[in-house]
Amino acid sequence: MLPDLAEALQQRRQEGLYRFRQVLEGPQSPRVTIDGRDFLAFCSNDYLGLANHPALIEAVAAGAQRYGVGSGASHLISGHSRAHHELEEALAEFVGLPRTLLFSTGYMANMAVVTALMGREDAIFADRLNHASLNDAALLSRARFIRYPHLDLVTLEKQLKTIQARRRLIVTDAVFSMDGDRAPVAELLALCQRFDAWLLLDDAHGFGVLGEQGKGSLYDPQEVERNVPHLIYMATLGKAAGVSGAFVAAQASMIETLIQHSRTYGYTTAAAPLLAHALLTSLQLISQGVWRRERLVQLIEQLRQKLQSLPWQLLLSDTPIQPLLVGGSREAVRLDQALRERGIWVPAIRPPTVPQGMARLRISLSAAHAGEDVDQLSAALHDLAGC
């Protein structure tokens, strides 16, 4: 069996699909150090530049002083601290939904929702470019799993009309992690109302970045209020929020159902309470950080203007995720390595993360970047393109 594994790994190398971990010597930042060498990084999902914010560092220390380091148990035993509880209440108020439930990761949150609600008699309708966690959750639930072409609501409507099921759940990224485009949330909620379905909205890359005060893809409070019975909102706390974790927000009966039936909630140790304590400060920074979101908009516009003349396709996106489509996996790796030789780190994204023939450089912007950083990246890419 071991020779089979070695052969499969070698095949992966030959196809340009082998992945390596990079060991950072310091905090997450637009400037990182790897093996003693400094890089200008466009890699992380630290969209607001909060991962190394002094106020969060102080909050973590204060949380450790008050709550210690570990939670020691699951939320359902003795691991649910005052910090966890206050964060859940603050998040519910922030996004405008009745209740929230904390999870250690977005993957666990998506798995919890789908497997707790759906079974063999049910149907899940999923955008073809959804995050892997949504796909894995759907498969594990044993529900019927129907995928529709990316953002194709005409096809989705036909599927909802023709496929009968006890329960129906539409699952979608709100901001698609590898393309940077957005799901039409209002239209999806309208379909849920028409066909008596739930919408699980994964806003991992929108929370903190989009909407008023960074409230994410739930930009219209009246729309949210009208659709509470149909809406299940998931967002992560390790991207724009700069810390770690995730939460699900929904009506009270939905949250209670997840507490009772979600295996990834009940059968795991709760995240360290010091993280929840720090996230209360993060939520304040997000709410008050209008200038950070404005800065991001400026950087996005600057980048798109400078990269339009490249021979590679810059996918349409108004979010911090700016994908540069190069096609083949080997070409993506070549460009990744050539940029690193110039002191710039932009990750090559290859199958199976993206479809075959759709390999890309995934440029991630942060409010911590400077305009000069974008200029440096642009100059390097134009040099590599021979422009």
From Swiss-Prot:
SUPFAM superfamilies: PLP-dependent transferases. Belongs to the class-II pyridoxal-phosphate-dependent aminotransferase family. BioF subfamily. InterPro entries: Aminotransferase_I/II_large, AON_synthase_class-II, AONS_Archaea/Proteobacteria, AONS_Proteobacteria, PyrdxlP-dep_Trfase, PyrdxlP-dep_Trfase_major, PyrdxlP-dep_Trfase_small. Pfam families: Aminotran_1_2. GO terms for molecular function: 8-amino-7-oxononanoate synthase activity; pyridoxal phosphate binding. Catalyzes the decarboxylative condensation of pimeloyl-[acyl-carrier protein] and L-alanine to produce 8-amino-7-oxononanoate (AON), [acyl-carrier protein], and carbon dioxide. The keyword Transferase applies. The modification N6-(pyridoxal phosphate)lysine is found at K239. The gene is bioF. HAMAP family: BioF_aminotrans_2. Its EC number is 2.3.1.47. GO terms for biological process: biotin biosynthetic process. It comes from Nitrosomonas eutropha (strain DSM 101675 / C91 / Nm57). The keyword Transferase applies. Its cofactor is pyridoxal 5'-phosphate. This is 8-amino-7-oxononanoate synthase. It catalyses: 6-carboxyhexanoyl-[ACP] + L-alanine + H(+) = (8S)-8-amino-7-oxononanoate + holo-[ACP] + CO2. Substrate binds at R19, H131, T353. Homodimer.
